[in-house]
Amino acid sequence: MTSFPRQELAKALSEASGPSKRPTQGQHAFTRITVQDSSATVECYNGVMRCASVVNAIVGSGIDILVHAEMLQSAIENTKAESVEITPEPNRIKLKVGSRVASVPTLPVADNWTERQERRALTRIQVSNHDAFVPILKIAHGIAKLSKFDDRKHVEITPENGHIRVACSNGYQTLWAKCDCITKGSGTTAVPVEAIDEMLKAASSSMLIRVFDNAIAYNSGSLSLESSIRADSKLVTPMIPRVMESHRKPDSPSAIVDRIELINAIKSADSVSQKRAIPSVKVEIDIAKTVVSCDNSETSVTSDVPADTIGATSFRFAASDIVG
């Protein structure tokens, strides 16, 4: 019998179970739990992505099991019990969670598990500005996941001297952003949106990204992730500077505004926008201000945001992905 702190085990299962929710074969719906000394590794792999998380303060004997991830997660939820007792049996484990007793199926590890292969990283990125990087990653993820084309369902990361470029496009929206990082290596990597999903679940102040010849690895807090890289991705990063240059004109209308004030104005307008047949927000660049507005025939909202402006213009855009 081996005893786990319930909340820590639930957290590790939540962080690591992403691949088990996208199984490509039957055994990929299972998670491997390995206990050695007083810590355990919870790991899931689906042939494309691998996630692992660590649980400490384990009491009892060492175990190595491949257990159904969703059933295990369900068995330890919605209880005030502080510990989970696991006893391995042939083809299953017995669980005791407070007064609750359950049985969860297992598979033989030797026949149904692929070990991680050690390899040398071509690129290393140490994120030094977590507060700036995570919002950029969230916006990029929101844009990329809306693409109707598989070859664009990714976020591109390009290390440069002292920072990284983050870029993506879904054919309608395009993002190109920069964030300070400690970098080593070069080249653009297309990270699948599924991997970005998992990265955002465990984005801590300590974030390390490593790129291999055909995979990307990510470490943050207690989570370790490794994902294959899309080989057939359509890269937008090399095209963006040329596209921006071709559309940029001297003294074209522009505005410098306070980010928080602008976001609050967009959120107010977007709440009204959702009742329009085609949700959109109107932005007007005027003298010393930017006006954000929307009406839906029932409600109208207008916000003036002080700005340092050049020229005047107006345009409409869908705001949900920016403020979401």
Q: Where is each model-derived feature located?
A:
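Structural preference for solvent-exposed beta-strand-turn elements
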Residues: 1-324
